[in-house]
């Protein structure tokens, strides 16, 4: 052990050991930004009695150290010269910026003023130390690297037994390297404890708060000293910009606190069980407990429960403040008495202050955190606990609108969703497709955009929610809203602008609805009864297709999305029936309620359409030119004809003619010709201009299939041949005037034809105006035209129309027939009911009668060789755009086989069918 000690002879001839300079353990750099004074400086300046072994430093130089063998290992220091004042417990630490709950506020003076105060602190300490016992020693080591003098008597060097003493010089302590001392591990220990009691005490507190040397707990202790015991709460020299009155106030405030509230806890090992005042749990005997002299003698805490009642942090070095039977750290105890400035972290001693956001500021300190502009009486915005003026806030934190890319100011409304921001205006916060405002409405965010509906998110036009809203169609399709028409005014003209579509429609009601028949001899009351047939229930199940510019959009006529359902066949009121019984026609009945009886010829045509047999368009013997002329003619009022708009006439205006035929029969009773005595060509010639109206209206329907005036309820029963009325067609034809179907006589009805012949019908031309390919196919129809003229002459009938218009009608019919060959609709085969209908006519004794003269084979071709051309292959059922009800393969194949089986008995007759 002597090898570690050197001896020297001083000027008095006395040999004394040479004490080497103190060796210190290396300390890791501290993360705390402020320089902390060493524990040595705390003890030398403030005389904090950290332990019973603490040595008071005398103001005079000590005599030379004695030999280690002559000096005791533990030297007991004399008692303190004076009783420790409250100020002795408050080390003059440097100020720490106030850290609020957000952790972001800072002192506006910490950058310059506090650093200047720190530089003024250490020269004073060094000057004081020059007269101390270690005047010949080097200056104190860097802060944070020196252990506490309370532990100086027991801290050993790494390799020997020489230590430095806290008060009486160094002590040579023979310590085995493996044994270790309990107190050498800590930078601070509670006073008055044995080593085993120190270990027991620190085992009761969290590990990260135990002040081991060079540990996280040591750095935590230093931070808590600055946080819990702010120096500017006690010393005037650490404050800034105080007036003389405020300086006096601070001294009085600090002295009062120390006198009335300051104390230090005492750690003892309990002899009996105690109840912790903090948690209420029992402290067992033998455990360590903390007592406070300013509380009742029996009050005790667990070491981990001796915390501040506000911040819940362990009271650093057991220094506490008492108020109303509660424990406080120095910071929060001062705040219970006076407010603290959120900017400079100092106690506000002035009479006035600014309070905002639940905190207080000096009046001059409540300023913008960025530009230091005072905000007293001004608008400001708090962000992260810091006030900003509006200009600085916009420059630093303003969001940008996703629509216009302009910044959203603090004075402007803002809409935010999922990290996106918009101006709260109708132009910015709007649907990305239709640009309708979404303010105050639910919206659909998708792919970074916002939409008002699912349709808009898919790029489609919005769908109306009910039938009263006009349907939004493509730009070239212009329709008038259904609500714009006055149904109660029969003279009101309503001309919808129906755009063209290349697909004609066939009404599904012709296949689905229950037919109603009424003979021609029935009265008008019976006809009105048939008007209110329950067709709307079936009509609501249909589907309407909107087609414009090859874009097909389908609406279901259920009353929710289709505008057509808003005027679908309301039932006829009884007043309408009784008011019009005395009239020959019911013209004053509103157009949407008027459903006349059908003629037998129309019954047969519609029956063939329902039975999926090709419709005989060749028998429609009128020209479109005549219909167009009548369509544009002036209104000629008649005694029993209502003034209606021809635009309200549907695709089958011959329905209105059949009413007039029946009324002519009732008003002019003459000798009737038998129905079977009239050839089908006579019947076809008896159907005048409305036949061409069928062609033109079907062409119009092929171009506009959205909104037609009325739905097509079918009230005829063509499946009961016994109820077929006997009509004086020949006399009625001769008695009809040329201008019969003028503007005031056409009754609003419609029949829709279904078929897909986009490739054969032009988009903007009617049949009668086509040229080129259509005329090249007219030779066969012209030859048939001559046969029809001969048949008319042999039957003794005279046609009311010139041969030119007659040929032109067949020219258009030929074009229709040729186009119908390519239509998938022509794959539909006749059903059983239509075959039974033909068998019934044959059973009457007229095998070569009119019922087979208008068969599907003769209507389109004169030989059975064209049947294969007429019936397309089965697999092409799915070609093109399908509208309404298309048969699937199984139904189509079944009907195909049934047609082939039923067509053999008539194949020979069909081949030998000659028109003369």
UniProtKB/Swiss-Prot annotation:
It is found in: Cell membrane. Residues 507-517, 526-569, 642-654 have a biased composition (Polar residues). Residues 274-338, 339-399, 400-462 form the LIM zinc-binding domain. SUPFAM superfamilies: Glucocorticoid receptor-like (DNA-binding domain). Residues 167-275 form the PET domain. GO terms for biological process: anterior/posterior axis specification; establishment of planar polarity; establishment of tissue polarity. PANTHER family: LIM DOMAIN-CONTAINING PROTEIN (PTHR24211), PROTEIN ESPINAS-RELATED (PTHR24211:SF20). Belongs to the prickle / espinas / testin family. This is Protein prickle.
